[in-house]
Amino acid sequence: MGPSGSGKSIIAMNLARQYALAKNVPAYYVQLSPEQTKTSLILGLRLENGSLAVKNGVVADCMERGGIIIVDEATHSVQEILLMFNSILDRTSVTAIGDKMIYAHKDFRIVFCSNDSRYSGNVKLPQSFAQRLVSFYFDYPTAEDEFLIVEQIVAEECRANDVVPVSLKRYIIELMREVRSNTYPLSVRNAATAVL
């Protein structure tokens, strides 16, 4: 967890990529929102050829295949969705609907990313869910690291000669760092946009 734009999701995606390559398993990504349901995310009944059938969501597929899944924007969901992860996060790591039970493969991993509690629009994490997690706080990178990240974003986005003076880029980053707040959580994405 950490402030918006601190690099949590990209770090998690890189971690997932490395894990998937090392274990030869799939990597998944899902971004939570209030509109999602247990059926769309985990496991549930869906209409198929006029009948209700039990179908896996992305989380159940990942559990069965022993993959790693990044669940991004966890605090932009609703508490009821987060609580549905409790049985998956338990030692038994199981989910069920009706008579279908899915036990997680031994290589299954799940990583949640979320903004910290100061971010407006966050849903409060249910205590029973939060107690099942190990959390790491990601703050904004140093000014020098932010400069290097902006350089990389500009190089990848422009695909042309970068004509913006280094001194101007450093000024933009310092200004961004000076005005950054919970109300205005400016990040390297904003600085790169200013440079572009």
Give the ranges of each region predicted by the language model.
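AAA+ P-loop NTPase catalytic core and its hallmark functional loops
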Residues: 1-170, 174-180
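The conserved phosphate-sensing helix
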Residues: 182-195
